[in-house]
């Protein structure tokens, strides 16, 4: 079963750690997930893959026994995880976590051109599957938790003039 992931930051200078987007899709089940993520381009790419892996792990009853191939347009993630390129220090924890899950869940990781990465595309390329099972999306933990900005307390009043 092919599963796709995509991550990017939304700043024109992609290596600056700013607001980004992570996305994954499981087309066979009509699943599309998107969330904001703070990080540079490569951190967002890794976070998208880790979010997909955690989704697969949480919902293994729907994927067990099926060969799983993760597809991404990130050559950095593919080459580092497949040991063709050394990971720089800032990406080491992401790569190590990816390798841990790869050994545990036994999936393949392949590069795909951006125009074929279904997680990067809009909704029009995703079919609705009315028979899709109910999935658990509780995929964030401390290593990939979305960073949030402090919110005002609910009891604080706002003055409008």
Predicted region positions:
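RNase H-like nuclease fold core
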Residues: 1-43, 55, 160
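A structural signal for isolated positions on well-ordered beta-strands in alpha/beta enzyme cores
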Residues: 2, 69, 108-110
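Acidic active-site catalytic centers that drive phospho-/nucleotidyl reactions
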Residues: 6, 45, 73, 120
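Short, flexible active-site-adjacent loop segments at beta-strand->alpha-helix junctions, enriched
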Residues: 9, 74-76, 113-115
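C-terminal functional segments of enzyme domains
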Residues: 14, 80-161
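Acidic helix/loop or adjacent segment enriched in Glu/Asp that either coordinates divalent metal
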Residues: 32-70
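Acidic/histidine-rich, metal-coordinating catalytic segments
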Residues: 68-78
